[in-house]
Amino acid sequence: MNAEAIQTPMTVDVKADDKPYFDAPSKMSAKNVSVFYGDKRAIDDVSIEIPQRYVTAFIGPSGCGKSTFLRSLNRMNDTIANARVEGEILLDGEDIYKSGMDVVQLRARVGMVFQKPNPFPKSIYENIAYGPKIHGITGSKAELDEIVEQSLRRAGLWDEVKDRLGDSGTALSGGQQQRLCIARAIAVDPEVILMDEPCSALDPIATARIEELIDELRGRYAIVIVTHSMQQAARVSQRTAFFHLGKIVEYGKTSDIFTNPREERTKDYITGRYG
Protein backbone atom coordinates (compact mmCIF):
# COMPACT_ATOMS: atom_id res chain seq x y z
CA MET A 1 0.00 0.00 0.00
CA ASN A 2 1.43 3.36 -0.96
CA ALA A 3 2.18 6.22 1.40
CA GLU A 4 -0.82 8.25 0.28
CA ALA A 5 -3.17 5.37 1.08
CA ILE A 6 -1.68 5.06 4.54
CA GLN A 7 -2.32 8.72 5.27
CA THR A 8 -5.81 8.99 3.79
CA PRO A 9 -8.96 7.09 4.81
CA MET A 10 -10.44 5.02 2.01
CA THR A 11 -13.01 6.78 -0.14
CA VAL A 12 -16.24 4.96 -0.98
CA ASP A 13 -19.21 5.71 -3.15
CA VAL A 14 -22.29 6.23 -0.99
CA LYS A 15 -25.30 4.72 -2.69
CA ALA A 16 -28.47 6.77 -2.88
CA ASP A 17 -30.45 4.10 -1.06
CA ASP A 18 -27.99 3.88 1.85
CA LYS A 19 -30.61 4.87 4.40
CA PRO A 20 -29.87 5.59 8.06
CA TYR A 21 -29.32 2.42 10.07
CA PHE A 22 -32.51 2.77 12.11
CA ASP A 23 -34.57 2.63 8.90
CA ALA A 24 -33.47 -0.97 8.29
CA PRO A 25 -35.45 -3.67 10.14
CA SER A 26 -33.34 -6.34 11.79
CA LYS A 27 -33.43 -9.86 10.32
CA MET A 28 -30.93 -11.47 12.68
CA SER A 29 -29.63 -10.39 16.07
CA ALA A 30 -26.66 -11.64 18.04
CA LYS A 31 -26.65 -10.93 21.75
CA ASN A 32 -23.50 -11.43 23.83
CA VAL A 33 -22.28 -14.28 21.65
CA SER A 34 -19.06 -16.11 22.46
CA VAL A 35 -17.71 -19.07 20.50
CA PHE A 36 -15.27 -21.57 21.97
CA TYR A 37 -13.14 -24.28 20.43
CA GLY A 38 -12.41 -26.39 23.46
CA ASP A 39 -10.95 -23.96 26.00
CA LYS A 40 -10.05 -21.34 23.39
CA ARG A 41 -12.43 -18.39 23.08
CA ALA A 42 -12.56 -17.44 19.38
CA ILE A 43 -15.44 -14.95 19.66
CA ASP A 44 -15.81 -12.79 22.75
CA ASP A 45 -19.18 -11.29 23.73
CA VAL A 46 -20.28 -10.10 20.28
CA SER A 47 -23.60 -8.32 19.77
CA ILE A 48 -24.82 -7.12 16.38
CA GLU A 49 -28.00 -6.52 14.38
CA ILE A 50 -28.11 -7.83 10.79
CA PRO A 51 -30.57 -5.70 8.77
CA GLN A 52 -32.96 -7.07 6.18
CA ARG A 53 -32.25 -6.34 2.49
CA TYR A 54 -28.82 -4.94 3.22
CA VAL A 55 -25.34 -6.31 2.67
CA THR A 56 -23.36 -6.45 5.89
CA ALA A 57 -19.60 -6.93 5.52
CA PHE A 58 -17.31 -8.42 8.17
CA ILE A 59 -13.72 -7.18 7.84
CA GLY A 60 -10.61 -7.61 9.94
CA PRO A 61 -7.17 -9.22 9.94
CA SER A 62 -6.69 -12.95 9.49
CA GLY A 63 -7.65 -14.91 12.59
CA CYS A 64 -9.83 -12.14 14.02
CA GLY A 65 -12.92 -14.38 14.23
CA LYS A 66 -15.06 -13.03 11.40
CA SER A 67 -15.51 -16.39 9.65
CA THR A 68 -16.07 -18.17 12.95
CA PHE A 69 -18.83 -15.73 13.81
CA LEU A 70 -20.33 -16.01 10.31
CA ARG A 71 -20.52 -19.80 10.69
CA SER A 72 -22.34 -19.40 13.99
CA LEU A 73 -25.20 -17.63 12.19
CA ASN A 74 -26.45 -20.90 10.71
CA ARG A 75 -24.82 -23.30 13.17
CA MET A 76 -22.11 -24.51 10.83
CA ASN A 77 -19.83 -24.64 13.86
CA ASP A 78 -21.97 -27.57 15.06
CA THR A 79 -19.94 -29.73 12.67
CA ILE A 80 -16.80 -29.11 14.78
CA ALA A 81 -16.69 -31.56 17.68
CA ASN A 82 -15.28 -29.28 20.39
CA ALA A 83 -17.08 -26.07 19.38
CA ARG A 84 -19.71 -24.45 21.57
CA VAL A 85 -21.65 -21.20 21.42
CA GLU A 86 -22.83 -19.04 24.31
CA GLY A 87 -25.30 -16.17 24.08
CA GLU A 88 -28.27 -15.75 21.74
CA ILE A 89 -28.55 -15.58 17.97
CA LEU A 90 -32.06 -14.71 16.85
CA LEU A 91 -33.67 -15.13 13.42
CA ASP A 92 -36.90 -13.13 13.31
CA GLY A 93 -36.82 -13.18 17.10
CA GLU A 94 -36.36 -16.96 17.43
CA ASP A 95 -33.22 -18.32 19.10
CA ILE A 96 -31.53 -20.57 16.54
CA TYR A 97 -29.67 -22.42 19.32
CA LYS A 98 -32.78 -23.32 21.27
CA SER A 99 -33.51 -26.96 22.07
CA GLY A 100 -35.41 -28.68 19.30
CA MET A 101 -34.34 -26.32 16.53
CA ASP A 102 -34.40 -28.10 13.14
CA VAL A 103 -30.86 -27.35 11.97
CA VAL A 104 -31.47 -28.65 8.43
CA GLN A 105 -34.41 -26.28 8.07
CA LEU A 106 -32.38 -23.46 9.63
CA ARG A 107 -29.67 -23.89 6.99
CA ALA A 108 -32.32 -23.68 4.29
CA ARG A 109 -33.47 -20.35 5.77
CA VAL A 110 -29.88 -19.14 6.30
CA GLY A 111 -27.86 -20.33 3.31
CA MET A 112 -24.09 -20.42 2.99
CA VAL A 113 -21.74 -19.78 0.06
CA PHE A 114 -18.20 -20.87 0.80
CA GLN A 115 -14.78 -19.49 -0.07
CA LYS A 116 -14.05 -22.14 -2.69
CA PRO A 117 -16.82 -23.05 -5.15
CA ASN A 118 -18.13 -26.49 -4.19
CA PRO A 119 -20.65 -27.71 -6.77
CA PHE A 120 -21.97 -31.21 -6.25
CA PRO A 121 -20.57 -33.85 -8.65
CA LYS A 122 -23.92 -33.80 -10.39
CA SER A 123 -25.45 -32.09 -13.39
CA ILE A 124 -26.07 -28.35 -13.37
CA TYR A 125 -29.79 -29.09 -13.13
CA GLU A 126 -29.39 -31.50 -10.20
CA ASN A 127 -27.15 -29.06 -8.33
CA ILE A 128 -30.10 -26.66 -8.16
CA ALA A 129 -32.88 -29.24 -7.87
CA TYR A 130 -31.31 -31.13 -4.97
CA GLY A 131 -32.29 -28.68 -2.22
CA PRO A 132 -35.93 -28.20 -3.24
CA LYS A 133 -36.28 -31.99 -3.50
CA ILE A 134 -34.94 -32.85 -0.05
CA HIS A 135 -36.86 -30.00 1.58
CA GLY A 136 -40.10 -30.99 -0.11
CA ILE A 137 -40.53 -27.54 -1.63
CA THR A 138 -42.06 -28.86 -4.84
CA GLY A 139 -44.06 -31.91 -5.83
CA SER A 140 -43.99 -31.69 -9.60
CA LYS A 141 -41.39 -31.73 -12.36
CA ALA A 142 -42.84 -28.55 -13.87
CA GLU A 143 -42.48 -26.67 -10.57
CA LEU A 144 -38.95 -27.99 -10.14
CA ASP A 145 -38.03 -26.87 -13.65
CA GLU A 146 -39.32 -23.40 -12.81
CA ILE A 147 -37.31 -23.24 -9.57
CA VAL A 148 -34.15 -24.31 -11.40
CA GLU A 149 -34.62 -21.72 -14.12
CA GLN A 150 -35.50 -18.87 -11.77
CA SER A 151 -32.60 -19.66 -9.42
CA LEU A 152 -30.14 -19.70 -12.31
CA ARG A 153 -31.62 -16.47 -13.65
CA ARG A 154 -31.25 -14.73 -10.28
CA ALA A 155 -27.66 -15.92 -10.14
CA GLY A 156 -27.02 -14.50 -13.61
CA LEU A 157 -26.15 -17.92 -15.00
CA TRP A 158 -29.21 -19.06 -16.96
CA ASP A 159 -28.22 -17.71 -20.37
CA GLU A 160 -24.80 -19.36 -20.07
CA VAL A 161 -26.04 -22.85 -19.16
CA LYS A 162 -29.66 -23.20 -20.33
CA ASP A 163 -28.66 -25.42 -23.26
CA ARG A 164 -26.45 -27.73 -21.19
CA LEU A 165 -28.27 -28.31 -17.92
CA GLY A 166 -27.28 -31.98 -18.10
CA ASP A 167 -23.56 -31.17 -18.02
CA SER A 168 -21.62 -31.57 -14.80
CA GLY A 169 -21.48 -28.53 -12.54
CA THR A 170 -17.79 -29.21 -11.98
CA ALA A 171 -17.11 -28.56 -15.69
CA LEU A 172 -18.00 -24.87 -15.34
CA SER A 173 -15.40 -22.13 -14.87
CA GLY A 174 -14.56 -20.99 -11.35
CA GLY A 175 -16.77 -17.92 -11.55
CA GLN A 176 -19.63 -19.93 -13.04
CA GLN A 177 -19.25 -22.56 -10.32
CA GLN A 178 -19.55 -19.89 -7.63
CA ARG A 179 -22.69 -18.48 -9.27
CA LEU A 180 -24.02 -22.05 -9.45
CA CYS A 181 -23.44 -22.36 -5.70
CA ILE A 182 -25.29 -19.08 -5.14
CA ALA A 183 -28.16 -20.36 -7.32
CA ARG A 184 -28.17 -23.58 -5.28
CA ALA A 185 -28.45 -21.58 -2.07
CA ILE A 186 -31.34 -19.42 -3.28
CA ALA A 187 -33.25 -22.38 -4.78
CA VAL A 188 -34.61 -23.25 -1.32
CA ASP A 189 -35.89 -19.68 -0.88
CA PRO A 190 -33.64 -18.57 2.00
CA GLU A 191 -34.11 -15.44 4.05
CA VAL A 192 -30.42 -14.81 4.72
CA ILE A 193 -27.36 -15.61 2.59
CA LEU A 194 -23.96 -15.92 4.26
CA MET A 195 -20.87 -15.58 2.06
CA ASP A 196 -17.43 -16.53 3.33
CA GLU A 197 -14.80 -14.92 1.06
CA PRO A 198 -16.86 -15.82 -2.04
CA CYS A 199 -14.45 -14.16 -4.49
CA SER A 200 -11.07 -15.09 -3.03
CA ALA A 201 -10.49 -17.88 -5.57
CA LEU A 202 -11.81 -15.92 -8.57
CA ASP A 203 -10.21 -13.68 -11.18
CA PRO A 204 -11.11 -9.95 -11.36
CA ILE A 205 -13.73 -10.42 -14.08
CA ALA A 206 -15.52 -13.21 -12.19
CA THR A 207 -15.23 -11.18 -8.98
CA ALA A 208 -16.92 -8.19 -10.62
CA ARG A 209 -19.79 -10.41 -11.76
CA ILE A 210 -20.27 -11.85 -8.27
CA GLU A 211 -20.26 -8.33 -6.79
CA GLU A 212 -22.93 -7.24 -9.28
CA LEU A 213 -24.96 -10.29 -8.32
CA ILE A 214 -24.66 -9.50 -4.61
CA ASP A 215 -26.04 -6.03 -5.24
CA GLU A 216 -28.95 -7.49 -7.22
CA LEU A 217 -29.76 -10.11 -4.58
CA ARG A 218 -29.85 -7.75 -1.62
CA GLY A 219 -33.28 -6.55 -2.70
CA ARG A 220 -34.62 -9.97 -1.67
CA TYR A 221 -32.34 -11.19 1.12
CA ALA A 222 -30.25 -10.16 4.07
CA ILE A 223 -26.67 -10.83 2.97
CA VAL A 224 -23.60 -11.14 5.19
CA ILE A 225 -20.19 -11.32 3.54
CA VAL A 226 -16.77 -11.98 5.05
CA THR A 227 -14.01 -10.40 3.00
CA HIS A 228 -10.32 -9.63 3.38
CA SER A 229 -10.70 -6.97 0.69
CA MET A 230 -11.64 -3.62 2.14
CA GLN A 231 -12.24 -2.35 -1.39
CA GLN A 232 -14.79 -5.11 -1.90
CA ALA A 233 -16.49 -4.34 1.41
CA ALA A 234 -16.73 -0.70 0.36
CA ARG A 235 -18.18 -1.62 -3.03
CA VAL A 236 -20.83 -4.15 -2.04
CA SER A 237 -21.97 -3.42 1.51
CA GLN A 238 -24.13 -0.88 3.30
CA ARG A 239 -23.06 -1.95 6.80
CA THR A 240 -19.58 -2.98 7.94
CA ALA A 241 -18.36 -4.60 11.14
CA PHE A 242 -14.65 -4.49 11.95
CA PHE A 243 -13.50 -7.53 13.94
CA HIS A 244 -10.27 -7.72 15.93
CA LEU A 245 -9.18 -10.42 18.38
CA GLY A 246 -12.63 -12.00 18.49
CA LYS A 247 -14.52 -8.78 19.19
CA ILE A 248 -16.39 -6.23 17.10
CA VAL A 249 -14.43 -3.01 17.45
CA GLU A 250 -16.82 -0.91 15.37
CA TYR A 251 -20.04 -1.43 13.41
CA GLY A 252 -21.97 1.05 11.34
CA LYS A 253 -22.70 2.43 7.90
CA THR A 254 -20.01 1.39 5.46
CA SER A 255 -19.50 4.98 4.34
CA ASP A 256 -18.84 6.03 7.95
CA ILE A 257 -16.52 3.12 8.71
CA PHE A 258 -14.29 3.92 5.73
CA THR A 259 -14.39 7.71 5.77
CA ASN A 260 -14.98 8.68 9.39
CA PRO A 261 -14.28 5.77 11.75
CA ARG A 262 -14.91 6.43 15.43
CA GLU A 263 -12.31 4.00 16.76
CA GLU A 264 -8.58 4.50 16.34
CA ARG A 265 -8.07 0.76 15.75
CA THR A 266 -10.54 0.87 12.87
CA LYS A 267 -8.71 3.81 11.32
CA ASP A 268 -5.38 2.06 11.72
CA TYR A 269 -6.69 -1.06 9.98
CA ILE A 270 -8.38 0.60 7.02
CA THR A 271 -5.39 2.85 6.40
CA GLY A 272 -3.05 -0.14 6.32
CA ARG A 273 -1.13 0.40 9.55
CA TYR A 274 -1.68 -3.26 10.48
CA GLY A 275 -3.55 -6.33 9.30
UniProtKB/Swiss-Prot annotation:
Primary localization: membrane
InterPro entries associated with the record: AAA+_ATPase, ABC_transporter-like_ATP-bd, ABC_transporter-like_CS, P-loop_NTPase, PstB-like
Source species, domain of life: Bacteria
Any Pfam family matching the protein: ABC_tran
Recorded GO CC terms: plasma membrane
Coiled-coil stretches noted in the UniProt entry, renumbered to this chain: none
Keyword annotations: ATP-binding, Cell inner membrane, Cell membrane, Membrane, Nucleotide-binding, Phosphate transport, Translocase, Transport
Gene3D superfamilies (alphabetical): P-loop containing nucleotide triphosphate hydrolases
Role: Part of the ABC transporter complex PstSACB involved in phosphate import. Responsible for energy coupling to the transport system.
NCBIfam families referenced in this protein's UniProt entry, alphabetically: 3a0107s01c2
Protein name: Phosphate import ATP-binding protein PstB
Species: Novosphingobium aromaticivorans (strain ATCC 700278 / DSM 12444 / CCUG 56034 / CIP 105152 / NBRC 16084 / F199)
Lineage, opening ranks: Bacteria, Pseudomonadati, Pseudomonadota, Alphaproteobacteria, Sphingomonadales
